[in-house]
């Protein structure tokens, strides 16, 4: 309650309630015993049912989508290792608008003067992410991994250009 698409609930940008419909189509196919191809597409339709007295109000229906295509492999260097290479677009609002409540001054009686402006909620950028992962089961209780990503327009922000990330993972069980 009080948030859209996993954002923080409450506050000036929160909503009182919303209804979201979601679908996902995904597929997986083995090329051989060591290599597989995968793909997924998700679509989202959200109707904000209540958002009064907020900075954003009077929402249209919001649509969003995400997609992914990739390859997964096992037994690359050793029997107990695996890797994946994917290209994806994280969830992105593709259409929708809302009225923005803009304060612009104080009246003689101390009241805040405001006007409403209709704004589009779809970002101007479109993140595309290229990700590479590698993991190896080192022992019964230890797994090691590495993750690398190149993100273009991260967060669907066209000003961010190309970003890279690298992480290592050590996972143990006791």
Regions found by a protein language model. Name each.
Residues 82, 136, 161-174:
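Outer-membrane beta-barrel "beta-signal"
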Residues 1-17, 22-28, 38-158:
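Outer membrane beta-barrel transmembrane domains
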Residues 34-36:
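Mobile, glycine-rich extracellular loop/lid and propeptide segments
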């Amino acid at each position: 309650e009080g948030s859209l698409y996993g954002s923080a609930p409450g506050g000036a940008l929160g909503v009182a309630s919303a209804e979201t419909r979601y679908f996902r189509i995904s597929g997986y196919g083995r090329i051989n015993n060591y290599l597989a191809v995968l793909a997924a597409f998700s679509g989202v339709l959200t109707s904000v049912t209540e958002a009064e007295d907020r900075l954003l109000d009077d929402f249209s229906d919001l649509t969003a989508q995400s997609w992914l295509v990739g390859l997964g492999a096992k037994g690359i260097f050793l029997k107990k290792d695996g890797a994946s290479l994917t290209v994806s677009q994280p969830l992105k609002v593709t259409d929708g608008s809302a009225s923005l409540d803009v304060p612009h001054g104080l009246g003689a009686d101390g009241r805040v003067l405001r006007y409403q402006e209709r704004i589009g909620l779809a970002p101007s950028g479109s993140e595309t992410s290229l990700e590479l992962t590698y993991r190896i089961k080192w022992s019964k209780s230890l797994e090691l991994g590495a993750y690398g990503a190149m993100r273009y327009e991260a967060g669907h922000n066209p000003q961010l250009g190309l970003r890279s990330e690298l992480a290592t993972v050590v996972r143990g069980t006791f």
